[in-house]
Amino acid sequence: IEMGRTAWTTLLVLAPAATVGLPAQRNRDRVFGLSQEEWCREARRSDVCEVREETVSNTRMVDVDARGNGGVHIRGWDRPDVHVRARVVVYADSDTEAKQIASEIKLVTTGGRIRVDGPSRDRNWWRDRGWSASFELEVPRNSELMVGATNGGVIVRDVRGRMDLRTVNGGLTLDDVSGDIRGETTNGGVDIRMTGDKWEGPSLEVRTVNGGITLALPPNLSAELEARAVNGGIHVRYPVTVRGLISSRRELRGTIGNGGPRIRASATNGGISITRR
């Protein structure tokens, strides 16, 4: 294909991509539903570790605020309520102080807004002590999700609905999802695995600043694809009909199958890999 000309072609392979970020792979390996003992064993440092549980009823919107230090793992189920587990980890100068801090930490689930409240965590407070909370949720499969995290990954599996998923330091993993989805991470990879012949919903848009993106697509998918890797290549092992101006190996616009909902993927410092699931 002559660069800079308008063209239609089906691509199977493009430029090699930069390494897709490891945080997304670690996300995928994360096991859901560990016992308290097993889950607490994963904590790097803890003087006190507890798992708190609550059930939330009559809510379709699930809003998880994990903007302390902890990740969020969500999976769909067939029940109408939301089951919440929060792993609370505390460290301090003494066991007595750690237990006191743990007693002040509360799991809040009011009106579908889920968070953990606890002692102030300013710079002086953090000097010799600290606490964090990670979440696991089972939600109805048609839930609307809003998730915010700072230091931790976000995983969503088997949910179909509107989603806004954001983290700063952590990977983003989506498996068997659909709907109207926006996902973003600053420092972490993005790993998406789709099922079905078409995306059930308006669009999917994901982006990362420092990390790569992997899209694993089912064989008979129909969608419109836009991919952009600013400082990395795009590696395609999937039939894509490319249209329009072909001027860069770092940008791709095309049609998969018969076309349909739009899939957008953007990486600033990292590559994009598009493969068959």
Range-by-range predicted roles:
Residues E2-R277:
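Intrinsically disordered, low-complexity terminal regions
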